[in-house]
């Protein structure tokens, strides 16, 4: 589901020239726009990832990719406004978080960090490093020695986990801009022109 699919169309429009000048030319529509409640859920999901477990780590891309990110507005689609009646229990303000290129890159870096190689000893059961052991009577046997491969493989995983946590922290502290309808239209110098429906609702000719 896209953001714009949830927005009602018609009833008016923004000016075509201001839209081109302030939105298209400045690539505002190329930024990610995530509804505030979806953004808060995404951050909670990313914080909850157990990086050391591959099945949990592999969810990072899904968490990020499934969130609608398109600009919830168009020339003839007005940015979402509040829902319900002001002062009543059904009133809800609608905010979107704008994810610019720098913050977008950090989110994409989370996917890359989570895609690092598996801990091969723990997750695909690679045998332990064999060593030759000399027993009583001089008999020699090849036995597995725990720890050699484990240390080698788990250290990058620990480093990756630390890097992932720092990235999540940076994303949370970045303070992404929030927009409601009024802020969006004020910031990008857009005016919504109301267009009245055709007389009779456009349902045919005169009687």
Swiss-Prot record:
Pfam families: TMV_coat (PF00721). GO terms for cellular component: helical viral capsid. Capsid protein self-assembles to form rod-shaped virions about 25 nm in diameter with a central canal enclosing the viral genomic RNA. It comes from the Viruses. This is Capsid protein. GO terms for molecular function: structural molecule activity. Gene3D superfamilies: Tobacco mosaic virus-like, coat protein. It is found in: Virion. Its main location: virion. Belongs to the virgaviridae capsid protein family. It comes from Peanut clump virus (isolate 87/TGTA2) (PCV). InterPro entries: TMV-like_coat (IPR001337), TMV-like_coat_sf (IPR036417). Keywords: Capsid protein, Helical capsid protein, Virion.
